[in-house]
């Protein structure tokens, strides 16, 4: 999750250097002092930068290990998992600020609960370009972002949408929605966020409503595109069925649904069992596979034929367009996860 500070225009000195030139009685002495101070700052920053880079590399390496997802994480209590993530990333956030690498308008890394995103802003832009390419999103589109998190896609919306377009994001994690409401505002007053009080064993254990009973707070045929980034990878079959039905309801005719999954096919199963990928689902439950019986919502993969049946049931195109990802060890792919794009018939 590397972020760089905006480069300083040529010829403009840092404030500290400018003050030395303006107030020093002897310009040569002032320049010497300024050089010494710059050298001290660089000397102090270098080990800090190395430490932060090492911490980031370690985190990304862990997220690429199948045993980390399928063995270690399920063994830890949910509260401890979330505390450890914050404890690990909070010093990285502090170091970013000291190094001048934190970008205003982006959430602290310790508050990002949506997986192994290296560059949050760049990830949002790439996601937008992907849905423009595969789902036909344009600046006038009405977009529904199911499971918007801390705004990975939403941060790209203010510069993308025109006055005719609109964005609605909802999520079940209160902290994510609160951050989005405070920090993401569009010029046309057409970007909105909603907290869904929906239960999930991993992401919202205090939620009062079951996802299988949840009705999206939107009118019929309100959206051109619905986007779900790594949402169904944490939802059980009965809940996926409900959400797909609700998405079909709120999509306009010929609207597109773009969702990411881990899809079990003969190819992905062979690669996964050979240890080629960074995800491993060891429990086969027929329609779906899971990391852990203890906390199924940590990671769920779906059988391709099962997904196609749900899509067909709710009036979405079958077969949908599937862009297989790299999670199981494929050398190439549109994304790490599999991306499925379907049209409302």
Q: Which residues fall in each region the model found?
A:
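A conserved beta-strand element that flanks and buttresses the S-adenosyl-L-methionine
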Residues: 227
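A short glycine-rich, Lys/Arg-flanked "PGG" loop and its adjoining helix->strand segment in the class I
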Residues: 241-253
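Class I (Rossmann-like) S-adenosyl-L-methionine-dependent methyltransferase catalytic domain
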Residues: 41-134, 150-157, 166-215, 256-345
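Helix-to-beta-strand junctions that scaffold the AdoMet/dcAdoMet cofactor pocket
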Residues: 162, 235-236, 251-252
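Conserved acidic residues
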Residues: 224
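Short catalytic micro-motifs in class I SAM-dependent methyltransferases
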Residues: 230-231
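Conserved class I S-adenosyl-L-methionine
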Residues: 140-149
């Amino acid at each position: 999750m590397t972020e760089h500070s905006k480069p300083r225009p040529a010829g403009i000195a840092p404030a500290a250097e400018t003050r030395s030139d303006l107030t020093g009685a002897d310009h040569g002495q002032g320049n010497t002092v300024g050089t010494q101070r710059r050298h001290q700052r660089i000397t102090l920053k270098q080990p800090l930068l190395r430490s932060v880079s090492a911490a980031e590399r370690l985190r990304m390496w862990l997220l690429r290990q199948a045993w980390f997802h399928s063995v270690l994480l399920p063994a830890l209590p949910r509260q401890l998992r979330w505390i450890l993530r914050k404890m690990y990333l909070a010093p990285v956030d502090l170091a970013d600020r000291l190094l001048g690498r934190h970008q205003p308008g982006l959430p602290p890394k310790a508050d990002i609960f949506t997986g192994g995103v290296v560059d949050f802003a760049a990830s949002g832009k790439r996601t937008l370009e992907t849905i423009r390419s595969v789902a036909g999103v344009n600046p006038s589109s009405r977009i529904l972002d199911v499971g918007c998190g801390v705004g990975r896609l939403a941060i790209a919306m203010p510069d993308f949408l025109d006055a005719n377009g609109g964005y609605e994001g909802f999520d079940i994690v209160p902290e994510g929605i609160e951050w989005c409401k405070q920090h993401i505002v569009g010029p046309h007053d057409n970007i909105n966020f909603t907290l869904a009080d929906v239960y999930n064993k991993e992401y919202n254990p205090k939620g009062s409503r079951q996802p299988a009973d949840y009705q999206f707070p939107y009118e019929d045929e309100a959206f051109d595109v619905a986007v779900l980034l790594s949402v169904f990878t944490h939802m059980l079959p009965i809940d996926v069925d409900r959400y797909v039905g609700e998405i079909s309801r709120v999509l306009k005719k010929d609207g597109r649904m773009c969702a990411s999954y881990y899809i079990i096919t003969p190819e992905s199963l062979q690669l996964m069992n050979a240890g080629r990928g960074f995800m491993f689902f060891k429990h086969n439950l027929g329609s779906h596979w899971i990391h852990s019986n203890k906390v199924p919502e940590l990671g769920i993969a779906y059988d391709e034929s099962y997904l196609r049946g749900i899509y067909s049931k709710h009036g979405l195109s079958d077969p949908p367009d599937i862009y297989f990802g790299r999670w199981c060890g494929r050398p190439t792919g549109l994304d790490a996860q599999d991306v499925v794009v379907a049209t409302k018939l």
